[in-house]
Amino acid sequence: MHFNSSGPEPKENEPPSPLVSGIIDYNMPLTSTYLKQMKLRVMNSQEQDETSVSSEDFDMNDSAWMSADPHLASSLSPSQEERMRSPQNLHSQEDDDSSSESGSGNGSSTLNPSTSSSTQGDPAFPEMNGNGAAAPMDFTATAEDQPINLCEKLPPGTALGTPSYPSDGCGTDGLRSRVKYGVKNTPESPPYSSGSYDSIKTEVSGCPEDLTVGRAPAADDDDDDHDDHEDNDKMNDSEGMDPERLKAFNMFVRLFVDENLDRMVPISKQPKEKIQAIIESCSRQFPEFQERARKRIRTYLKSCRRMKKNGMEMTRPTPPHLTSAMAENILAAACESETRKAAKRMRLEIYQSSQEEPIALDKQHSRDSTAITHSTYSLPASAYSQDPVYVNGGLNYSYRGYGSLSSNLQPSASLQTGNHSNGPTDLSMKGGASTPTPPTPTPSSNSTSRTMPTAQLSPTEISAVRQLIAGYRESAAFLLRSADELENLILQQN
């Protein structure tokens, strides 16, 4: 603490003026010893005769207060030692102990800028200028002279700035204490703009600032590549759940993602309707894992991008620790159930669309159309028995074999449409349009064709049939992929 001969001295029971901040060294620790020394210094200076005060006493006391050392009595003058031994000072020392410990000492008022600014209306304090006259004080203090709130960190170069210490009148203890409590010029985090309790508590505790608290969440965390392992759904997260069903659920998601999504695109950029369809399928087949379906999709897409980045093969089989015979059975049952439900939903859609736009047909012709529709629905059942189509020896599938599937279905269609005995019903695709054409008239039905108009499908029905065909193809490709993985599993086990 730097006391100079020209600086004013505050009274005992009054808060210091704004100019006192130029005297107080805020680098000193705020301890009871520091408060006692400060108050003793004020009381001793008031008891001294103004005519006997010299600049030597202030220079000597400067080094004594700055050192913050227990050897205070050795640096005091003999007259000051006698005053400290007097009963009055001993009594005031005890009062200082109690006041500083209870946190209501006068030294604490220097920490609050609002209390220090309230002294501007008080009478002027006496000035130690040797003539005993009380001169008015200048209250026009600059921003650097204002008291500083110690609860907030000061940015480097502001308020305190770089400390400059006088070289005269300072001992080794004083220099040591200045080095210890010097201002840090290292860049720190900016001070909080609001003096809230949380910010003060964070600063006082000295803990590193948590930059994640209070920050607005990212727009979508699906694109970050965290350290999630490829298929590492922790088993401890699924306590009370069947681990075999968890494995089947993981493979179920993998198959759906492989068939419907681009594995190099993050989930946030995938088509929303496809993501929602996969989540709904997972909810139907694995209701206990419906909450983690989206996370499972995101994790698998991340692993695919990571493996592509590392140059690994994407058409790899399922890792052995993530599958088992029971899990494969559960997966096959789930796939079959999902296929049946998808076909049922599409049939209902077609039925509803046909009810909305009825076509005036004869009963015989409506029975023929119904038989044709049922023969179309038998496509997946026939596709199950077909040999999988391999491309370049890999596990990929193609749709090139579906033309033969339609020709194989022609005998069954002709059996169900018994009236057309002269030839099979034509179910071939014309011009790339995936819609079945009306039956080809035969000589035996020419008379019927002349009297009855040819059935024409409405655009709504055509769209519904196309959706049905696309669903069948996806189901067939899905089952082909499942068969390939099962075959690879058998080869790995043997």
Curated annotation (Swiss-Prot):
Keyword Ribosomal protein belongs to the record: no
Keyword Phosphoprotein: yes
Xref: InterPro entries: HTH_NOL4, NOL4/NOL4L
Biased composition (Polar residues): 43-55, 410-425
Alphabetic keyword roster: Phosphoprotein
Biased composition (Low complexity): 100-120, 443-454
Compositional bias segments (type: Acidic residues): 219-228
Residues recorded as bearing Phosphoserine in the entry: S189, S354
Top-rank taxon, per record: Eukaryota
Basic and acidic residues compositional bias, start-end: 229-243
Region annotated Disordered, chain positions: 1-24, 43-243, 410-459
Pfam family, one: HTH_NOL4_2nd
Annotated S-S bridges: none
Protein name in the entry: Nucleolar protein 4-like
Protein source organism: Mus musculus (Mouse)
